[in-house]
Curated annotation (Swiss-Prot):
GO terms for molecular function: G protein-coupled photoreceptor activity. CDD domains: 7tmA_Melanopsin. It comes from the Eukaryota. Highest level in the iris, high level in the inner nuclear layer, possibly in horizontal cells, and lowest level in retinal pigment epithelium. Expressed in melanophore cells of the skin. Disulfide bonds join 100-178. Residues 1-32, 86-102, 168-198, 272-286 are extracellular. It comes from Xenopus laevis. The gene is opn4b. Glycans are attached at residue 189. This is Melanopsin-B. Pfam families: 7tm_1. SUPFAM superfamilies: Family A G protein-coupled receptor-like. The keyword Protein biosynthesis does not apply. Belongs to the G-protein coupled receptor 1 family. Opsin subfamily.
Amino acid sequence: MDLGKTVEYGTHRQDAIAQIDVPDQVLYTIGSFILIIGSVGIIGNMLVLYAFYRNKKLRTAPNYFIINLAISDFLMSATQAPVCFLSSLHREWILGDIGCNVYAFCGALFGITSMMTLLAISINRYIVITKPLQSIQWSSKKRTSQIIVLVWMYSLMWSLAPLLGWSSYVPEGLRISCTWDYVTSTMSNRSYTMMLCCCVFFIPLIVISHCYLFMFLAIRSTGRNVQKLGSYGRQSFLSQSMKNEWKMAKIAFVIIIVFVLSWSPYACVTLIAWAGHGKSLTPYSKTVPAVIAKASAIYNPIIYGIIHPKYRETIHKTVPCLRFLIREPKKDIFESSVRGSIYGRQSASRKKNSFISTVSTAETVSSHIWDNTPNGHWDRKSLSQTMSNLCSPLLQDPNSSHTLEQTLTWPDDPSPKEILLPSSLKSVTYPIGLESIVKDEHTNNSCVRNHRVDKSGGLDWIINATLPRIVIIPTSESNISETKEEHDNNSEEKSKRTEEEEDFFNFHVDTSLLNLEGLNSSTDLYEVVERFLS
């Protein structure tokens, strides 16, 4: 029977094949497979939306695209699978012309929305990684919401076109689903098919490939530049920051690859028909690619369940019945250290003459120092030997992350030693010379100031010294957005922290880091610093 032959039913054109001689078990198998795919897509994408609803830390601006992708995939599964399953049981399309139009319209709308959302994710990751300064204005929640609205409007335009006369929606393949008429060789159908494939599939695919190629080159270039930095701590921080951004990009890349592989067979079939070889396409060759394309709705939650640590953690905590499928990820020490130290940057970043150092709350060596000082009194020789023994491994280990590099010298030592200390604020309280780097506001040049120990053993040298303020600068855009989100959602915690800062900080003196006035002994100093760090 000629598949290209058509007849008119009112204003709609449908295939003249009323019944297709297909074994019942084949239709039942296809229908059952579609039902399973639809069920997994509905449940999986609901879990994704539930995870973003329960975990406020996931509601960052870049993740809005993931939420939009989950919504479109959920609606795709909910509108396509049940109808297709019922039609397979009846061995033909059962909802008539209006149902065919609605079914095909929904499939086109949600499918195009998913593709355009993946394109937006790729562009967003590209800007964040290659142009981090410009990404600040393009990665706000308001701007992200505007982009999502444009994605839906663009998808709606292409989905409405067949209803307005540019091509048409007809049953396809085994007549258990509907799509636009890409088989009939008319100018309207051919032009719509070509424009749809180019503007919705091929051009976005080229843009996505371009974005990820230059993202990879930027990551490699940044990695080389980081290796040239002299500070191990700065190397580690920048490397980890770029790793976080690249991790998000890799998750999106896996989703995009799977999505493209799912829709590629369908695109090939439409192009074969567009080239004038539609008669060579069998009902099976048109139905199977359509089923594979609609199955793309289930891959997003599966990929997130495997790769995304925060998603796994949220599902593991809130859905106990899925704990045997989703393992709880290990805690990210880097993220916790940055969030735990973020309040140090909020008040100190506005000071003009401070040197910005990237540090974290790493473990301190103070306990070892105090254990080796008899009766709590500082002894120059014993303290020097203890500090050298503790810090020498850090000089040999290039992987020691989140460290504060300072130059520590003794006043009378003709050959000062450079050692690398953990980034604890306790290190500045020891009776040793401390060199700090400050920036002159007039000449815009950096200079080194050496703060010597008072030979009398007093604490005035600490109070009067120009110490560098220690702030946290998260170079990662995702860290900035997550920090803003936590700051907005934890106002009570912020007020408590502010009260604590007022107790232990004294910023009315431009050159002091801690309020050390009124201290008479090293024991008092140790207690103040201990309270500050706790």
